[in-house]
Amino acid sequence: MDRRARGLLTGLFFTGCLLILGLGVPLHDAAAVSDLFAALRVTRVATGSPIASFDLKNLEGETVRSMELAGKVVLLNFWATWCGPCKGEMPSLARLQSQFDPTQFQVVTITTDMHPQGIKQFLQHLGIDLPVLFDEREDVSRSFMVRGLPTTVLITQDGRAVGRAVGPRAWDSEESVALVRHVLEGMK
């Protein structure tokens, strides 16, 4: 083999290695992430839309501001006590939360129900300790275009919605955990 052919093959070899290594990012990541979204039936929000800011009351009557969630990955779940599928997925949301450090990842539930005592009893009965915020005027629900319950939105540390699911999911599944980890790693 002459020098020119050897040089060409060497160049192709190194180019191939760089493509395979992806300069530190595996080639399968994009496909694997798409598979996670698809497996969970979570619609990807293409551009990562910034969320609208909000101030809502929690079960204790204290105001919680969306900016307090900055720096965390957030799974925002819209639900109601009259919604059977919402109540059915609540334990899986709690199990998902238990797998992550709450300073990095937070499941936050938002309801239009206006009966804090009933919600407290419901959550205590199930042994669930998740934050509940009240959307009295449904302004936040409208800003997230909630058309059916449950609706869940996945939000990055910098406040951008990257995924949306309508209907119940098994939020403690391997795919859900992997998706949250992926977002925690900065959607690399």
Predicted features along the sequence, with ranges:
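N-terminal targeting signals for export/organelle localization
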Residues: 1-53, 174, 188
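A short beta-strand-turn-helix
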Residues: 45-48, 53-74
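Active-site acidic short loop of glycosyltransferases
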Residues: 69-72, 102, 128-129, 146
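Short pre-active-site segment immediately N-terminal to redox-active cysteine/selenocysteine motifs
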Residues: 72-74, 78-82, 148
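Hydrophobic beta-strand core positions in alpha/beta domains
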Residues: 75-77, 109, 153-154
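Conserved redox-active cysteine motifs that mediate thiol-disulfide chemistry
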Residues: 78-95
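Thiol-based oxidoreductase modules, predominantly thioredoxin-like and allied folds used
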Residues: 104-116, 128-137
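Thiol/disulfide oxidoreductase modules built on the thioredoxin-like
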Residues: 121-129, 135-185
